[in-house]
């Protein structure tokens, strides 16, 4: 059923416009989000929005597909295939207090045969679609992400694409950002969605910055997946975040100031084959990673990939990224995140330091209560499921006895007999200030 139909008025984009109002800002609240595939799910949108809200997330991220919005040149309308996503963006802020990300995703057969928007007509058309979308969701959607994983060819018809030159993506950012800000000056525009942990990702980012990308966007989105890395340290939350710290240092060097970063996708699969990890390991990973990200002022949010498993094949990586099982029962990851959700949403970071022997110390406060978090860095921690990435017993630093992976331990300051766990287990102690 057609919900809305509107003839487009072409947006004439003047590339000489001054961008004094589109600047990097540093005051956004930390968002805790989850990626969704609302078009694929069996229930109506409120079922999932309520789940997300109840589990302690204040944002979700989903695709708003250009090809489903503009199916006749110059005509923008929603159709049944995207109703659930469209309605979610329209109601999630008012009904659930959420700040969603709308991903302005992928190509359109009307212009570039479903590949990259790489010619002038396609880029202008993409900007028109971005304008229509931002106007439709003004006051309802806070974040707009320009494309998704341009470097990887995600969403294109060609499964092994060669991305167009960096200048093409820059031009797309330039025109789409102008269009979005014209429709809604308060919109937060982000772009990138690449992996900064690999050298070619950083080079691509640096090239975009040198072209002037930061004059058009409010922050850079990244997807720092590392579960396939041969560098064991990058497979740990500490090593992953430290690499992002290095990337931020490079951004400061190029931009002369701190640049907001949005981790719009990150996840670890619980598949049983190669590159899959145990559910307990993933639960601890999510706890540590979220706390570490929260401690960085330049990281403005984390959106975990994803809400629920996408398929039934336990050996398929893409089927096992969910924090929930496909039947919506909770994995340990969701159970563990629920235990820190209030801390993430309502506490602010007061102190972060690492001792010379690798002990991580974080202090959070909500003005009345204080939360102290500690664990010992372990860059060699194992959590793989497959025979090629075999799970190894964890050892305590004292007696080297095998230890089960524990996601986290929550203590009261008055507790006299804390449980015995591995030194790399995060321990959270709450006390009154």
Q: What does each of the following model-derived ranges do?
A:
Residues 28-132, 138, 145, 151-157, ...:
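N-terminal substrate-binding region of glycoside hydrolase catalytic domains
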Residues 12-22:
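Bacterial N-terminal signal peptides
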Residues 60, 133, 144, 176, ...:
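Conserved, mostly hydrophobic/aromatic
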Residues 288-382:
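Aromatic- and carboxylate-lined catalytic core of secreted/periplasmic carbohydrate-active enzymes
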Residues 350-355, 366-433:
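C-terminal beta-sandwich/jelly-roll accessory domains of carbohydrate-active enzymes
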Residues 2-14:
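Bacterial N-terminal signal peptides that target proteins for export
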Residues 42-43, 75, 111-219, 223-249, ...:
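Active-site cleft segment of glycoside hydrolase catalytic domains centered on the general acid/base Glu
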Residues 32-36, 60-62, 98-104, 142-146, ...:
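Hydrophobic faces of well-ordered beta-strands that scaffold small-molecule active sites
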């Amino acid at each position: 059923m057609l919900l809305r139909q509107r003839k487009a008025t072409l947006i004439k984009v003047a590339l000489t416009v001054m961008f004094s109002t589109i600047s990097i800002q540093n005051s956004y609240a930390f968002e805790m989000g989850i990626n969704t595939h609302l078009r694929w799910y069996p229930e109506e949108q409120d079922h999932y929005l309520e789940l997300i809200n109840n589990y302690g997330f204040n944002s979700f991220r989903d695709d708003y597909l250009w090809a489903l919005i503009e199916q006749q040149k110059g005509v923008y309308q929603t159709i049944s295939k995207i109703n659930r996503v469209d309605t979610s963006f329209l109601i999630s802020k008012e009904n659930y207090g959420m700040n969603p990300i709308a991903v302005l995703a992928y190509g359109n057969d009307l212009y570039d045969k479903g590949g990259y928007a790489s010619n002038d007509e396609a880029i202008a058309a993409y900007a028109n679609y971005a304008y229509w979308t931002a106007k439709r969701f003004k006051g309802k959607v806070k974040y707009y992400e320009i494309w998704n994983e341009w470097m990887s060819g995600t969403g294109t018809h060609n499964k092994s694409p060669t991305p167009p030159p960096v200048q093409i993506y820059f031009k797309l950012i330039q025109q789409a950002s102008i269009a979005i800000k014209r429709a809604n000056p308060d919109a937060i525009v982000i772009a990138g969605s690449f992996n900064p942990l690999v050298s070619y990702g950083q080079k691509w980012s640096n090239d975009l910055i040198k072209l002037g990308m930061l004059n058009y966007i409010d922050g850079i989105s990244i997807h720092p997946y590392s579960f396939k890395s041969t560098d064991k340290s990058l497979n740990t939350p500490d090593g992953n975040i430290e690499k992002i710290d290095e990337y931020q240092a490079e951004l400061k060097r190029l931009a002369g100031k701190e640049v907001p970063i949005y981790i719009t996708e990150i996840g670890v699969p619980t598949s049983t084959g190669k590159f899959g990890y145990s559910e307990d390991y993933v639960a601890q990973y999510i706890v540590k990673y979220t706390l570490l990200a929260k401690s960085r002022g330049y990281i403005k949010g984390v959106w975990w990939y994803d809400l629920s498993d996408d398929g039934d094949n336990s050996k398929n990586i893409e089927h096992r990224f969910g924090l929930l099982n496909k039947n919506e029962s909770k994995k340990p990851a969701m159970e563990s995140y629920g235990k820190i959700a209030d801390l993430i949403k309502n506490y602010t970071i007061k102190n972060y330091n690492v001792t010379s022997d690798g002990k991580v110390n974080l202090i959070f406060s909500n003005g009345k209560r204080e939360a102290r978090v500690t664990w010992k860095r372990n860059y060699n921690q194992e959590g793989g499921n497959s025979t090629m990435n075999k799970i190894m017993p964890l050892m305590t630093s004292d007696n080297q006895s095998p230890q089960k992976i524990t996601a986290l331990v929550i203590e009261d300051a008055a507790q006299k007999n804390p449980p015995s766990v591995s030194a790399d287990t995060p321990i959270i102690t709450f006390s009154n200030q």
